[in-house]
Structures are given as structure tokens and as C-alpha cells.
Design a protein with these regions (language model features):
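Sequence-structural signature of mature extracellular/luminal beta-sheet repeat domains
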Residues: 1-216
Length: 216
């Protein structure tokens, strides 16, 4: 999966359709997510309803100019952050409601495992705090109705064909939440805006010198 067509081209898709988040490894390699190779940002809801692994994780090495896909078949991969060990990273899959860990160096190179699963909402960006814990922004909370729809592909197909797009079921993105998670995947704390009045749809949060900065 390498090509020299341009710095940010990969062989299985000459154009980056929806790059999302990135982080830089200690050796300068850039790891970034492409949320979907099928849809534009304005069509995010279609990707959510499709529920397929249309996304991928990509590595660009400035030293060689190569760009390659390292993981594919991901369900709207979103936030990416390098772990403290400098050999692995965490990435969010928004519609799968999970965080995974991938080792790009070291003895476990190429290994992928679930870090945090069955989250109560849809993870967006994630960042490592000054104490080594991770801050995960949930852009919205899951509902039983949408969860049920995601288990029924036939229902989703009929809905898309017979109902106007502005009346489709959508993920709930009107309630903000931020999770603080340990290096082992244990949820330490959760900050909520249950009414969605002050910080609805939190997409990212960063900690700096003890202060937390949410973005919505």
C-alpha cells in the first residue's frame, strides 16, 4: 500500500476523502485517521447508517515520503493519540463506540486490541493528559432506538429508500460528555452536560497544566 504519486496519496485511494485526526510519533512519523473513504463530511449520517468499516488508519513517514494504510475496515475512525510508550497509539471508532490500541513499533508491532468497548456514547477525539491518563470526548450519547436500528440493516435500507433524509434516525449528538481513562482502560472520571445546554456535542478536550479545555 505505498505510492509515490504525492506525499498524501495511498495506492488504494488516490484522494484522501475525509482525513480526521492525527498525532506524531517520537521518530516523526505521522499517524492519522481517515473516517471514511466513501463519503464527504456532509454525508456523515449516511456513513453512520451504513455501519460498515469504510475507514482506515494511515501512516506518513516524512523521512521517506511514503504514505501507507496500516489498518483498514474501521468504523469511522476518529481521534488518534500516541501512547506514553512511544510504540503504540489509541484510536477511536465513532459508530462502533470503542477505543482500540495499535502497536506500530516494539515487540508487539502490528498487534491490535480493544482498549475500551461498549462506550455509552460516540467517541470523537482523544488526547493524553500530563499525568499519562487519556481524555476522551463523546460527541453524543447512544439511544436504544438507534442501537436497535444499527442491528437491523434491512430496516435501515428501507428507511433510506422510503423516507426523506431529514426524517431519518440519526445518532444523538446533543449531549456532551468527557471521559478520563487510565493507561489500562479504566474509566476514572466522567464529566457530563446531560441537558446539552452548555457543552453539547463535545468533539475534543485537552488538559494543560491542570485545566481542561473542551471543544464543541
Amino acid at each position: 500500500d505505498e505510492t509515490n504519486r504525492s506525499l498524501l496519496s495511498v495506492i488504494d485511494d488516490s484522494r484522501l476523502r475525509l482525513p480526521d485526526d492525527l498525532d506524531i510519533a517520537p521518530d516523526g512519523r505521522i499517524f492519522f485517521s481517515e473516517a471514511t473513504i466513501r463519503y464527504e463530511m456532509s454525508e456523515w449520517a449516511v456513513d453512520a447508517l451504513e455501519g460498515r468499516g469504510n475507514g482506515r488508519l494511515i501512516c506518513h513517514d516524512p523521512r521517506t515520503g511514503s504514505t501507507r494504510t496500516i489498518l483498514r475496515g474501521l468504523i469511522f475512525p476518529n481521534g488518534v493519540t500516541i501512547c506514553r510508550d512511544g510504540q503504540s497509539l489509541l484510536f477511536a471508532e465513532t459508530w462502533a463506540c470503542r477505543i482500540s490500541r495499535y502497536w506500530f513499533d516494539g515487540p508487539d508491532k502490528g498487534k491490535r486490541e480493544i482498549f475500551l468497548d461498549n462506550l455509552p456514547g460516540y467517541p470523537d477525539n482523544l488526547n493524553r493528559g500530563s499525568d499519562g491518563t487519556y481524555w476522551i470526548a463523546l460527541l453524543g450519547m447512544r439511544t436504544r432506538t438507534f442501537d436497535l436500528a444499527m442491528r437491523k440493516p434491512g430496516f435501515r435500507r428501507r428507511m433510506a429508500k422510503r423516507i426523506a433524509a431529514d426524517e431519518w434516525l440519526f445518532p444523538n449528538i446533543n449531549r456532551g460528555c468527557v471521559l478520563r481513562v487510565s493507561e489500562t482502560g479504566e474509566i476514572i472520571d466522567a464529566l457530563w452536560d446531560e441537558a446539552g445546554e452548555n457543552h453539547p456535542s463535545i468533539t475534543s478536550t485537552c488538559e494543560h497544566k491542570g485545566w481542561l479545555y473542551p471543544v464543541s
